[in-house]
Amino acid sequence: MSDDIKKGLLGIVVDETEVSKVMPEINSLTYRGYAAQDLCEYCKFEEVAYLILNKDLPNTIQLKKFEKEEKNNRDLSKDLYSIIKKMPKKSHPMDVARTAVSIMGLEDKETTDSSEEANMRKAIRILAKTPTALAAFYRIRKGKNIIKPKKNLNIAENFFYMCFGKVPQKEIVKAFDVSLILYAEHSFNVSTFTARTITSSLSDIHGAITGAIASLKGPLHGGANEEVMHMMNKIKSPNNALKWINNALDKKEVVMGFGHRVYKSGDSRVPTMRKYFAKVAKIKKDKKFEKIYDIVEKVMIDRKNIHPNVDYPTGPTYHLMGFDTDFFTPIFVISRITGWSAHIMEQHAANKLIRPLASYKGNKHRKVLQLNQR
């Protein structure tokens, strides 16, 4: 293969962005210039969502207005609730999220308006409704009644309430909120580039986010947090961890939750999420997954010099919170809607159709024979 061909667009800079910057050389990630770790420390997810969408952190009045608009748009139409009830219970929640957002596009009165103002309003509506749709399916597939959203709860609290009927301890809510902040945006990743590619054809925001969700479902992208939990469940006990991971490496198996296309010496989001993973484990009085985590991480670094990515601590954290494993990536969706929406609006602002080239390696020109001659 020619050196001119960059499989996976490796190392290719395709555009500029103001939304976020990944700096692997100093192990840092910033949203609009603010370090993600600092945002986790001093802000709640709603503030970060506002920042990503509006380019600056909100003041008290701006945040109150943003939160009011989000809360007023949480409930779903009767038709969408009905459709979710009819979805097969075995459906993967990512497929439910993708379908729900697509239907939101059918129902939205501003679907054909792609002005920045309309896209901002639609982004907030998608952010508000997607957790409700996912929580509704979470309960339906368990044979339970849907719990409607409450306006006196923030996004993190409300999702717990709609899924479980109650809001957990504030430390667990904070850990969930931190995960939303860390998952909110990450430059030109696969799903974001998918959203921008769709947008470049002047398609609508619902279509672009639907495509992004489909991209995020893959285990090499968002689905990795689910695979991490499947791996830990296979290991079962800290006593098995050392043997399991060494055996996996000896067989040259892929160990999910490790490595990153950009970060080579460690994902900048991991230390923060690891800290909150420990806090949740302490509250739940369950150290098993923490012990497995540490053993597997040490072997991966010692033997392969491969560090964990943010999916590695997030998977067991969500598990300890009580979420089903196949809901881990849909939670990622709830958060990343903000990043996708910001990139969609940025693409619209200076658009050029994304149309790369391919080097043909198939047959040369061939003569077509009629059917009776073949």
Identify what each model region corresponds to.
Residues 1-374:
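Non-transmembrane, aqueous-exposed alpha-helical and coiled segments at domain scale
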